[in-house]
Amino acid sequence: MNKHVALGMTGFSLIAVTYGMARFSWGIMLPDIRQAIPFTPEVAGIIAACSYVAYSLSVFLASFLTDRFGPRLPAVLAGISAAIGLVILALAYSPLILATGLFIAGLSSGLASPSLAAAVSKRISAERQTQVNTLINAGTSGGIILSVLVLRVMSGNWRLACIVFAVMALFCLFAVLRTLLRERAEQLRSPPRWRVVLAKSGMFRLLVIAFVSGVASAAWWSFGPELLQRHTGLDSAITHMLWLVSGGAGIAAVFTGSAAKRIGMRGVYCCSLLFMAVSLVSLALSHGFAWWLFPVAALNGAGYVILSGVLLVRGAALAEPSPAAGVSLAFLMLAVGQIVGSVAFGQLYGAIGAAGALVFFSGLSGGLLFISPEGER
């Protein structure tokens, strides 16, 4: 197996575990968790925000560890924190324990992305980096698909599913240890100065986009299944199917690099925002099952994963020769936005209802069409 394939598949697997299972499986498990451990939508938003707070902290740590010790250490820590957090979730009996487990699991995704971006920058030729990065980023969808399938097989037993996810995280460590080799001291460099990275042309604009994108995306990724069941009135079987479609559609992010060659990265970026905006408005207007909910779910899944791929590629490019720092900053602001979005959507949901909250969050995605990560109008 050549290094492009080995690194791509290892990264895909690690992202699947840390994002799809340790982070985004919360959304699909939320309705069942609320039946076992009752709490309000406002509390649900606060618990979901814990994952993003953890992400915000670990993404800085990942950049430091990557530059000081190489990509291997933070990648290994990502798998370990995912496993520990998922086990705590499986054993939880109160909202506080749920928040603790989700926080520890949330550390994993922040550790994973910058380390993998740095590994790609060091080991993959420049002309192949966008394709490998977007392949790795699509692991989010792979993890979501697998998490839905596991939950279906286990008839919604979310505690047992969390244990299965934790075991998968530990298995992923073997691939990480084999593919990401320990680096020699002379290959490492001192951590970048954040002021230097922030001063890079176009970086501030990218961070604004990442923040607002995070706010807008929280509606679906923190409350999607809850909305499908309580707002739209679907049963758990259809909800799981729609979540599976949403995750599966995100696999389209694998083709981000190829699409960018045809319509440009700005075109890819605009499409991703339109996907997210249209899907949220459609969900706001839906009551009861309709066939068009399947493309709605697909649009949201594809839109978010493609958009995060744009942020990853652009952040890494702007921050050269310290791509991990650029990815860390972009994904940090994405996570900060998701913290704000999770809490804000929970409050709006409780105050004005799901429809009004969804329309408002859709407008955030639409507004970003007027700001390009490349500075074009």
Regions inferred by a protein language model and the residue ranges of each:
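Helix-loop-helix hairpin linking two adjacent transmembrane segments in secondary transporters
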Residues: A126-L180
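Symmetry-related core transmembrane helices of the 12-TM Major Facilitator Superfamily/SLC fold
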Residues: A161-L177, G356-P373
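Extracytoplasmic gate region of multi-pass secondary transporters
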Residues: W26-G27, M203-L244, I251
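C-terminal transmembrane helical hairpin of 12-TM major facilitator-type secondary transporters
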Residues: R266-L311
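A late C-terminal transmembrane helix in Major Facilitator Superfamily
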Residues: L318-A354, F361
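Cytoplasmic helix-loop-helix junction between adjacent transmembrane helices
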Residues: G101-A138
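Helix-to-loop junctions at the C-terminal end of transmembrane segments
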Residues: S58-G70, A252-M265, Y349
